[in-house]
Regions:
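Catalytic core of membrane glycerolipid acyltransferases/transacylases, capturing the structured
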Residues: 112-143
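Membrane-anchoring hydrophobic helices of lipid-metabolizing enzymes
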Residues: 2-118
Length: 143
């Protein structure tokens, strides 16, 4: 029962953050939530897991390099969090998404199979949204 009450209050906090994010607009919300996640994120127990994973990735990283990666990750989480409530905006507005080589996508409408591999910054759903805008059938797998 306590778990359900805890989840209820967590949901209220998330919804309030979404409402605030929607009220202040996407550009300001991205900045504020990047800073918020950067400030609050390291307080969670996942901090040790993140640090250990980076040590496994490369034991040659300096402390400042590791810290820079971790800070970038928390900022990215902040942007991703807030962008979920703006997915409808991204569907209508192309100016916020950039894709190098997007001219190559046009030639893919002849129903031949293709695999897209992407790097992403912030919200990873945006790539598939942009491809689907071009009327290309798409199945998406995230890992």
């Amino acid at each position: 029962m306590l778990k359900k009450i805890n989840y209820f209050f967590q949901a209220i906090i998330i919804y309030l953050l979404f409402i605030i994010g929607r009220l202040i607009g996407i550009n300001i919300a991205r900045k504020i939530f990047s800073y918020l996640f950067l400030s609050v994120g390291p307080l969670f127990k996942s901090k040790k897991i993140i640090e250990n994973n980076l040590k496994i990735f490369s034991d040659k990283l300096t402390d400042s390099e590791r810290e820079k990666i971790i800070n970038g990750m928390w900022k990215n989480y902040g942007m991703t969090f807030i962008e979920y409530i703006y997915l409808d905006y991204f569907k209508k507005n192309n100016s916020l998404v950039s894709a190098k080589g997007s001219e190559n996508i046009i030639s893919l409408t002849d129903n031949k199979p293709v695999i897209f591999v992407s790097g992403h910054f912030a919200n990873f759903e945006l790539m598939s949204m942009e491809i689907r805008k071009r009327k290309i059938k798409l199945a998406t797998i995230y890992r």
